[in-house]
């Protein structure tokens, strides 16, 4: 068989037409050193700050130091098998985590991967972990309450939707217990919750998850776990990942509550990363931008207005505001609130709940110190009935503390002073509350009414706890309809005042104290 020149030329033309070459430009580099979870890379000329760098074995590192001839990056996960000379490449993306309702009821790691053994999470939405906080024009003032269920908190340091309220205290003073009870109290409020555990023991996190499940709050909660066994990079990024998950609800006109437990450990993880990257240390060896570490996180907690939600959802949600309320936790050393990280976070947040080890050890739990605990914006969000009835609580406690210190040195006291001391002791006793026993607005109102209008004056100090239990049982059993209505509205007027008075009068008439 012979081919003529025309056929050959046609065949060549056909082959040339079918020839397809795809050229792909990739920005690659080479690892030049690996140490303590930090890798130095040579050759990545176009890398961005915070960009994800693809490593061998389906892992990623995050570029943090951009130097003249190398890039310092922190590895997200195990790094023992990484070696000098390995090739890495830019991805052109910053870190994103899955967000959405599919994560509710699940325990995930910093990267949003499930670690609870319940299978994959069905999810299509992703959000960057670093997002600029809403601007001043997009925000709305805080005027709706977040009920924690604690008498001491809801009456003296109320929290509003969109507020940042710091929980600060030494170790073992009930900081996590307070935050977990606040989450449990939201199970029927419609507020979605995110609990971010940073640098805690895995057994402690498992215990928290079990308690949330026992009290029916896990289905409404996302748990982001970066335990003590995780790398410093994952502990540093966990709060930002949790915040991105909370912002999903805020930006769609819903309300969310996020607990960061705790930001002291995040600051330590960031200090570790910064020192390994050879960044210059500052006060207490923290890097110079440790304030910015927390401010850019906590500024993302806010209440946004209807226009913001409508613009974000492209008109799907109208006439709704969204909020993300933050409860950051800070652990102090020997009650020193003037240390670097505590003062930073106090200055960023809208108030603080200070828990004292002396109060905790003397049996006053929650160990809230009313003298230095404050809520800067929560007062305008407080439920009307609680606001009206709780006015005398803080004053009574302040006078009691002052007189108690004086009474230690004075032997004979006049009747007015004795009366004030007795009242202060009873109020202190009444504000005690067990864990996992949050109270509704109506239940708190009944108790505060009893304090405000002298129904405790003839009750012995040792019987205060049983008086409270019996009073709540009587109110819920005999006035269920009124209690439900008060929970719904939270209003206070002459009619409600008369009803509360009749409840207390009826209770005192039927039982002797």
From Swiss-Prot:
Belongs to the ATPase alpha/beta chains family. It comes from Haemophilus influenzae (strain 86-028NP). GO terms for molecular function: ADP binding; ATP binding; proton-transporting ATP synthase activity, rotational mechanism. F-type ATPases have 2 components, CF(1) - the catalytic core - and CF(0) - the membrane proton channel. CF(1) has five subunits: alpha(3), beta(3), gamma(1), delta(1), epsilon(1). CF(0) has three main subunits: a(1), b(2) and c(9-12). The alpha and beta chains form an alternating ring which encloses part of the gamma chain. CF(1) is attached to CF(0) by a central stalk formed by the gamma and epsilon chains, while a peripheral stalk is formed by the delta and b chains. The lineage of its organism: Bacteria, Pseudomonadati, Pseudomonadota, Gammaproteobacteria, Pasteurellales. Its EC number is 7.1.2.2. ATP binds at residues 169-176. Produces ATP from ADP in the presence of a proton gradient across the membrane. The alpha chain is a regulatory subunit. Keywords: ATP synthesis, ATP-binding, Cell inner membrane, Cell membrane, CF(1), Hydrogen ion transport, Ion transport, Membrane, Nucleotide-binding, Translocase, Transport. GO terms for cellular component: plasma membrane; proton-transporting ATP synthase complex. Disulfide bonds: none annotated. This is ATP synthase subunit alpha. PROSITE patterns: ATPASE_ALPHA_BETA. Pfam families: ATP-synt_ab, ATP-synt_ab_C, ATP-synt_ab_N. It comes from the Bacteria. CDD domains: ATP-synt_F1_alpha_C, ATP-synt_F1_alpha_N, F1-ATPase_alpha_CD.
